[in-house]
């Protein structure tokens, strides 16, 4: 498959909010936008093994797996129950927290059971910076939605990359705040990047690709 074309098509259709997603999935609370959700649903339509770092309540995880034949893996410590967008006012934050009495871990598991095939899903609770990724199979699609700090991204990606398949799509969320970690790793490891697509936004934009995406096809 031409992964570069698949990425560009997924971005185009995601921008139009065209995917297999229904309104119930779009209603899952998450710090993201509908365009990102639709993009993930489209990108995962090719199947394979999908890893998501930082699943929170399952907005992007459920979007990625819904209607797709993927083996999906999620990792999160579920330690931030009141996670909110960086730039919201106190008034908007209070509004966003309405009807969020269910803790993130419980909410995530409920959403996964509702919208996914639990026989094709594994969820690990823990620190993604110290997780033993060698226990995982080779990864075809990776969505990093963890901390945007250089250290967290660098340490985590260094651990994940050895588990990449022959061709892996790496998606970095919050690309507006690119720390430079992936670029340093690409240089250090001599990684072969056959396609690179950067999507920038005005920042935390519900009508666009939220806070940007960095998308890479990395070949071994």
Where are the language model's segments positioned?
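N-terminal auxiliary segments of SAM/dcSAM-dependent transferases
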Residues: 1-2
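S-adenosylmethionine/decaboxylated-SAM
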Residues: 6, 10, 23-26, 37-220
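Class I SAM-dependent transferase core
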Residues: 12-31
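N-terminal pre-P-loop "Q-motif" helix
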Residues: 32-36
């Amino acid at each position: 498959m031409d992964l570069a074309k698949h990425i560009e098509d997924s971005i185009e259709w995601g921008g139009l909010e065209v995917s297999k997603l229904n309104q119930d999935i779009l209603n899952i609370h998450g710090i993201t936008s509908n365009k990102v959700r639709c993009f993930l649903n489209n990108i995962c339509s090719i199947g394979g093994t999908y890893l998501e770092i930082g699943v929170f309540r399952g907005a992007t995880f459920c979007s990625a797996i819904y209607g797709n034949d993927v083996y999906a893996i999620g990792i999160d410590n579920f330690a931030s129950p009141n996670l909110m967008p960086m730039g919201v006012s106190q008034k908007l934050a209070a509004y966003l927290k309405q009807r969020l009495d269910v803790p993130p871990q419980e909410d995530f598991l409920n959403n996964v059971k509702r919208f996914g095939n639990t026989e094709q899903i594994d969820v690990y609770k823990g620190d993604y910076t110290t997780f033993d990724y060698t226990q995982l199979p080779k990864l075809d699609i990776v969505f990093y939605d963890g901390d945007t700090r250089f250290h967290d991204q660098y340490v985590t990606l260094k651990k994940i990359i050895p588990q990449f398949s022959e061709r892996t799509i790496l998606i970095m969320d919050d690309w507006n705040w690119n720390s430079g970690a992936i670029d340093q790793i690409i240089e250090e490891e001599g990684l072969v990047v056959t396609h690179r697509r950067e999507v920038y936004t005005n920042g935390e934009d519900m009508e666009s690709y939220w806070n940007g995406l960095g998308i890479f096809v990395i070949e071994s």
